[in-house]
Swiss-Prot record:
The organism's place on the tree of life at top rank: Bacteria
Pfam families according to UniProt: SeqA, SeqA_N
Main location, first listed in the record: cytoplasm
UniProt similarity note: Belongs to the SeqA family.
Protein name as catalogued: Negative modulator of initiation of replication
Region Interaction with DNA: start-end pairs: 100-101, 129-133, 163-169
Signal peptide: none
Recorded GO CC terms: cytoplasm
Oligomeric and partner information: Homodimer. Polymerizes to form helical filaments.
Organism encoding this protein: Haemophilus influenzae (strain ATCC 51907 / DSM 11121 / KW20 / Rd)
Keywords: Cytoplasm, DNA replication inhibitor, DNA-binding
Function field: Negative regulator of replication initiation, which contributes to regulation of DNA replication and ensures that replication initiation occurs exactly once per chromosome per cell cycle. Binds to pairs of hemimethylated GATC sequences in the oriC region, thus preventing assembly of replication proteins and re-initiation at newly replicated origins. Repression is relieved when the region becomes fully methylated.
Subcellular location: Cytoplasm
MF (Gene Ontology): DNA binding
Amino acid sequence: MKIIEVDEELYQYIASQTRSIGESASDILRRLLSLPVHTSIVNDLIITSAETDQKPKQAINVKEVNIKTTKKQSITAINQIVEKVQTLLNSTEFQEESKAVVRFLAILRVLYRTNPESFAQATESLQGRTRVYFARDEATLLMAGNHTKPKQIPDTPYWVITNTNSGRKMLMLEGAMQSMELPETLIDEVRSYFTVN
């Protein structure tokens, strides 16, 4: 992997083209430039690398992964979360808040406070290819670099990175909300606060 420097405008454009959590700059540029994605399949795991064809083949160690079964939420629990999130979205304080990071933290706080177990499962599954988005301590997030700007989600034991653009914040929220089995209509309502007009 090579490192290149780009100006802020180009960086923001590339970041705005992100389609999924964990998508790297290389993945985004390959997609934008219509270049093929290099993949190889090992034991039903897909390994993606821009350097696959450039290096001699190496043995790849694949460790066994224990798949956790996630506990489905009851309709009552889902409805309770939906109600709490909608109450937050409709509050004057939230409506008047201009900072995306404050809105982001407020929504995460409500998700956690309404169903901590479901929130914990959701955040465990949300990680980028090279980055951890949520942790129970600041140090874990700082291991990826001081530039991650970790902040504690108010009234929770969780920390989250905040040096992301609004689009990435929404992808993180969307991933958590989908994992918590919340309806797409609610996710779309939240999305309206994180899209640039």
